[in-house]
């Protein structure tokens, strides 16, 4: 169970996302119900993943999964990689509104992030951004040796990456969560 303040933050986040989405098309979510489902989807892996203190979310878009995770885990530090200006501006706005002092936005592509500035992370997340193998190849240098990837993928994940073991995945409805230790890559 999360503290009451988290639910207030989720509501503010959802309202702001829908407001911005009307103008800037940040996400496919068009109702508060779909935003709340996306929030639940973002938080679901907290049930079974190892605890973490640092996380990079690649292709943060409208804030899923990073903003809900940052709200739920205020003791962890989050770096959001989002190169598109309208989305990085939205993320910066919501961080200020919610006073998420544990989050920073980097308006840059993952290919251009300097390793000297971002490294030794516990967790890297991404939701439906690119092919899993390509994403892992581009970002594994940022993980610590005991770090993990948590990729939020759709049902095409199995076609996208047939060599990746299904034992490394867990599912909920049409979502596949790929959770992999960096030493096993």
UniProtKB/Swiss-Prot annotation:
Q: Which residues are recorded as binding S-adenosyl-L-methionine?
A: 59, 64, 110-111, 127
Q: Where in the cell is it found?
A: Cytoplasm
CDD domains linked: AdoMet_MTases
Q: What chemistry does it catalyse, as a reaction equation?
A: guanosine(527) in 16S rRNA + S-adenosyl-L-methionine = N(7)-methylguanosine(527) in 16S rRNA + S-adenosyl-L-homocysteine
Query: What are the annotated GO cellular component locations?
Result: cytosol
Broad class of enzyme this protein falls into: transferase
What does the record give as EC number?
2.1.1.170
Record-level Gene Ontology MF annotations: rRNA (guanine-N7-)-methyltransferase activity
This protein's UniProt keywords: Cytoplasm, Methyltransferase, rRNA processing, S-adenosyl-L-methionine, Transferase
Entry-linked InterPro entries: rRNA_ssu_MeTfrase_G, SAM-dependent_MTases_sf
Q: Which residues form a coiled coil?
A: none
Coarse class of the protein's main subcellular location? cytoplasm
Q: Could you say which protein family the record assigns here? A: Belongs to the methyltransferase superfamily. RNA methyltransferase RsmG family.
Q: What does this protein do?
A: Specifically methylates the N7 position of guanine in position 527 of 16S rRNA.
Its recorded name reads Ribosomal RNA small subunit methyltransferase G
């Amino acid at each position: 169970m999360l503290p009451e303040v988290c639910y207030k933050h989720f509501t503010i986040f959802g309202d702001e996302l829908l407001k911005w989405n009307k103008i800037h098309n940040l996400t496919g979510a068009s109702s508060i119900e779909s935003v709340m489902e996306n929030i639940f989807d973002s938080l679901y892996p907290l049930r079974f993943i190892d605890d973490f203190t640092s996380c990079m979310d690649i292709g943060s878009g409208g804030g899923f999964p990073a903003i809900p995770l940052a709200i739920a885990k205020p003791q962890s530090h989050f770096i959001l990689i989002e190169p598109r200006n309208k989305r990085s501006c939205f993320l910066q706005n919501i961080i200020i509104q919610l006073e998420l002092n544990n989050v920073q936005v980097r308006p840059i592509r993952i290919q251009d992030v300097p390793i000297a500035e971002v490294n030794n992370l516990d967790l890297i997340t991404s939701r439906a951004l690119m092919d899993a193998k390509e994403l892992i190849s581009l970002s594994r240098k940022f993980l610590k040796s005991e770090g993990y990837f948590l990729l939020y993928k759709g049902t095409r994940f199995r076609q996208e990456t047939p060599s990746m073991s299904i034992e490394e995945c867990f599912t909920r409805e049409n979502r596949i969560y790929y959770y992999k230790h960096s030493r096993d890559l």
